[in-house]
Swiss-Prot record:
It catalyses: GMP + ATP = GDP + ADP. It comes from Xylella fastidiosa (strain 9a5c). Essential for recycling GMP and indirectly, cGMP. Pfam families: Guanylate_kin. This is Guanylate kinase. The keyword ATP-binding applies. It is found in: Cytoplasm.
Length: 204
């Protein structure tokens, strides 16, 4: 059975990565795809763990070579997902999660219409700005640039299947877990996963 592709997007500072990481710690059936980026790593980030960090020139070479399943320019830096991180895993029956922006999500949905997409919103603009400043990872210039892009990013929430409001962290994690569980219980999924049982039950 082919795996399920999940897409999670949010405006910068919404807590997307924290929610995704906490959810995947509880759910070992989904693999997080590691994205490529042309930006410099932050102090707490590690190559091949948080991102594959490459130069802007190398990223452009990968674009020209057709290596990316999706890619986009996000806050003046390139980000993208390699084909090899997605298609082989899905074909092998593994569920894959892409943590990407709305531009990349739109590209992915055009290629895989049945991908399940989730958008995370903050409880308020003030909370979003507070989180961006508290994480202490970006300069004031970068924070201002990210805040300026917030409205456009959040305006795309209605392109996604599910919306989670990250007001209380544990609630948001539980809601994401519930989406994954509900996906596995869909009739078309259960029909394939339990084909022998269903065939036996329905045989006169």
């Amino acid at each position: 059975m082919r795996g399920t592709l999940y897409i999670v997007s949010a405006a910068s500072g919404t807590g997307k990565s924290s929610i995704v990481n906490a959810t995947l710690e509880r759910d070992q059936q989904i693999a997080l795809s590691i994205s490529f980026t042309s930006r410099q790593p932050r102090p707490n980030e590690r190559h091949a763990q948080h991102y594959y960090f490459v130069s802007a020139d190398e990223f452009q070479r990968m674009i020209e070579a057709g290596d990316f399943f999706e890619y986009a320019l996000v806050h003046d830096d390139w980000k993208g997902t390699a084909h090899q991180s997605v298609e082989p895993q899905l074909a092998a029956g593994h569920d894959v999660l892409l943590e990407i922006d709305w531009q990349g999500a739109r590209q992915v949905r055009n290629k895989i219409p049945d991908a399940i997409s989730i958008f995370i919103l903050p409880p308020s603009r003030a909370a979003l700005e507070e989180r961006l400043r508290k994480r202490g990872q970006d300069s004031e210039e970068v924070i201002h640039r990210r805040l300026a892009a917030v409205h456009e990013e959040m305006a795309h929430y209605d392109e996604f299947d599910y919306t989670i409001i990250n007001e209380h962290f544990e609630t948001a994690v539980s809601e994401m877990s519930a989406i994954f569980t509900a996906s596995r219980l869909r009739r078309q999924t259960q029909k394939v996963r339990h084909a022998n049982l269903i065939r036996t039950l329905l045989t006169p």
